Amino acid sequence: MENKIKVVFCGTPKIGADVLKALIEMNEVEVVLVISQPDKPIGRKKQIVYTPVKKLALENNLKVVQPNKIGEIYDDLAKLEFDFLITCAFGQFIPTKILKLAKTDSINFHGSLLPKLRGGAPIQYAIKNGDKKTGITIMQMVKQMDAGDYYVQESIDILDSDDSGSLFEKMGQLAYSMCKKYLVDIYNHKFELIKQNENEVTFCKNISSEEEKIDWNNTSLDIFNLIRSLSPSPISYTTINSQRYKIKSSKIINLDNQNKNVAPGTIIDINRQGIVVKTLDSSLLILEIQKEGKKMILASNYYLNKLSDLKISDKFD
C-alpha cells in the first residue's frame, strides 16, 4: 500500500493496548496520535501508573495525549489528517464533531455481540448474566452509545472456568486478530454495514459498589456468576457483624437434605476445600477469601490453620 492508513487511536486498559499493538504491527497503518485516559494513582502508596495504552504507545515512540475530556483537544485533532478514529475501551464520550473528522470512518471495537450489552461493562455482564457466548463487534460510532451500524462480529465461548480477567484476555486476543484481519477491507469499503436490531437491544451500565455485594438469597449460580464477573477486580464481597470479606472465587455444590431449612448466608461447613455457605437453592464453596485489612487467602486455611474469625453456623448478612 503506497499511502498508509492514518489512524488516531483512543483506548485505556489492556484490551485497548491489544488493538493498538495490532495497529502498530500492520505495515499498512500509521498511528498518528494515541489518546488515553489520564493516569491515576494506584494502590495504597498512590503511585501514578501509566495506562496500558500509554505505556505501549511510548514504547513505540508514538505521540500520546491524555485530556480529561477529548473535546478539549478538538482544535488539535482538526489540524490532523487521518482516515480512521479507532477506539477500544477508551472510557470517554466522544462528541459527534470529533467523530466526523475521520476521512473514512470512526469505529469502535465493542466487547459484546451487539445489539446485546450496549454500555460500559459488557464483558463483566456477559459473565454475570451467565451467557455462554460473547464476542467483539467492529461498529460505526454515532452520537447514541453503541447504537451504530456494524461491519463485522466474531464470537468466543465463555467457559465456567472464566472470570472477567481471563475473558478480557481472550477478548483482547480476538480484538487484536480482528483488527489485523478486517481493517484494510473496511478502509477499502469491502463491507456492507449491518443495522442493529433495536428489538434485541440490552444494556449494561457500569457495576456499582452496591451491586458488588453478594445477596445470599440468590441462587448459587447467580452468586457464582457475580463472583466470576468481578474477579480479579474489584472483587465481590459479603459482610458479617459489619466486617467485610472479599470473595474472589467459588464453586457450586449441592446440599444434603438436612440443610434445606438453614437460612441463606449461613456457614454450614469449613473443610479442606474451603468454606461452605447456604444459598437460596443449594450451597456455594468459597475458595478464596480476604478479610478486610488482610491478604487474600485460600479459604481452606480456615480449616487447616484453625482460623477463628469465621465459624460454622455464623451467618453472612
Swiss-Prot record:
First-tier enzyme category under EC: transferase
Gene3D superfamilies referenced in this protein's UniProt entry, alphabetically: 3.40.50.12230
This enzyme's EC code(s): 2.1.2.9
Protein name: Methionyl-tRNA formyltransferase
Pfam families: Formyl_trans_C, Formyl_trans_N
Organism: Mycoplasma capricolum subsp. capricolum (strain California kid / ATCC 27343 / NCTC 10154)
Record flagged with keyword Flavoprotein: no
Binding site residues for (6S)-5,6,7,8-tetrahydrofolate: 112-115
Catalytic activity line of the entry: L-methionyl-tRNA(fMet) + (6R)-10-formyltetrahydrofolate = N-formyl-L-methionyl-tRNA(fMet) + (6S)-5,6,7,8-tetrahydrofolate + H(+)
Similarity-based family: Belongs to the Fmt family.
Entry superkingdom: Bacteria
PROSITE patterns: GART
Task performed by this protein: Attaches a formyl group to the free amino group of methionyl-tRNA(fMet). The formyl group appears to play a dual role in the initiator identity of N-formylmethionyl-tRNA by promoting its recognition by IF2 and preventing the misappropriation of this tRNA by the elongation apparatus.
